[in-house]
Structures are given as structure tokens and as C-alpha cells.
Amino acid sequence: MTVLAAFDSQTGILMVGHGSREPDGNEPLLELCRGVEKRLGITPVQPCYLELTRPTIDEGLSSLYRRGVERAIVVPLQLTAGRHVRYDIPCEVGKSLAKLSNMFVCFTNHLGAHSTLVDMADSRLAEALADQPPVAGSTQYVLVARGSRDPLVRGEVFRLAQIRQFMGCIEEFTPCFLAMAEPTFEDCLKTAVSRNPTRIVVQPYLLYPGRLLNRIRGTVAKLAAEYPHIEWVTADALGPDDRLVNCVVDLAKEAQEQDFHRQLV
């Protein structure tokens, strides 16, 4: 169980999701916030989104400020430390703090930095294969992430694929991307097919179900129709998962051991 000793009513947590135009795509973050708030008791927890929907980061910090919060712990709920984590979120926080006197902040690591995410990925893969009988031939494993032009993001995904490969005693777990980076998802699947496997397993590196997971499943369905002799398996997104509450609390506790400051633009 995570230790909660240092949290109080004047220290709030701002949980920053990406945001979706589809209301159903934003509900998992709200549910996660309710779980974190229940765990922490008197500590205010506020959801917000970087883009596409509300509340915005500015609205989220302002809400915490009105609730008497003097110190805000900002938790980026992103799986990789791309531009959103390193620039966009701090920039928006800085703009907001310029209007909020006497509020200080600290930033946690992004969600994907928590080691439990690897365990969650392992759980989703095990669930996807639970009802599948063993196959006599070879299996190709594909890890597909959002994608970014940022080489650091690409490196994170490649490292995760290596960890998954090692933990699962899998010969090869091939990383690929939906956009803005190579290898692309489509090219990776074509390569997997060319190796004439008995089964192809696709693991989406996505936090929650939504438009991108539907896109992945659609691509797999088309190829399954084209190559019916191959067994195709697609795992679910990482969440919802009760362990995400522990991840957020762990990251927040680690971050608050740093100094709070005013992050101004």
C-alpha cells in the first residue's frame, strides 16, 4: 500500500489528460481522479485536459486555487515524455500561475515512467491470449504506440518493446507507430505477415480505449480478412486498471519531495 503521510488539504493534485472530442473518451480520466481522491482523503484532486475538451489546465488550476490549494502537484497522464510533457503542459501551467498569486507547483514524471505500466501491459497480453490455444507454428508480436517526431519518444517505445520481449521470454516484440514515426503500424504488420507466422499478436500501447484503439482493431480486421490462415489477436488498452491509482499516488509522493516553485512563462 502506498504511504500517504505528507498529503493535506492545501496540497492538490492536477491530473492532466490529453483530451478527446468524444465524451466517452474523457470519462476514464474522471473515474481515475475519483479513485485517487478516494485514496488520498482530504487532498483535492482535479482532472483537466491539454486540448480538445474542458476543463483546461488553466481551469483546473483555478479550481484548485478556489478550493484553498497552495501547492499543486501536476501529473502528466501521458505514456511517453514527448512535447506535451516536456513543453506544452509546463507552458500552460506557467501561464495559469501568472494569474494565481501564492500558488506553487511541482511536476511528477509522466505516467509511462512508472514501472507498473509494464506489469499492466503484461496483464493485457495475458488476457488477450487466455482463451487462445497454443499454436504449433511461430507467433509474431507487435507493440504499437501513438507516435511522435521526438526521438526520445521513439526510444521509450523501443525500450518498452525490449522489456516486454525479455519479461515474456519472447523471441521478438517489434515496436511501431500509428503516426509521425517509423516503422509504421501498417509496414510492421506487412513484415509480420511476410514471415508466415501462425499467429500475429498486436499490443496497443494506449492508456485507454477510444478512437486510436478502434483504428488499430480496424486495420487488424482488414488484414485478418486478407490473410485468414493467420490467427490475429489484439490486446486491449492498458486501462482502465485499478493499479493506475497506485501509479498516480506513487508519482505524486515522489514529486512532492522536491521543492514546489512558481513555473512562470
Listing of model-derived features with the role each one plays in the protein:
Residues 1-265:
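Active-site-proximal alpha-helix that buttresses catalytic centers in soluble enzyme cores
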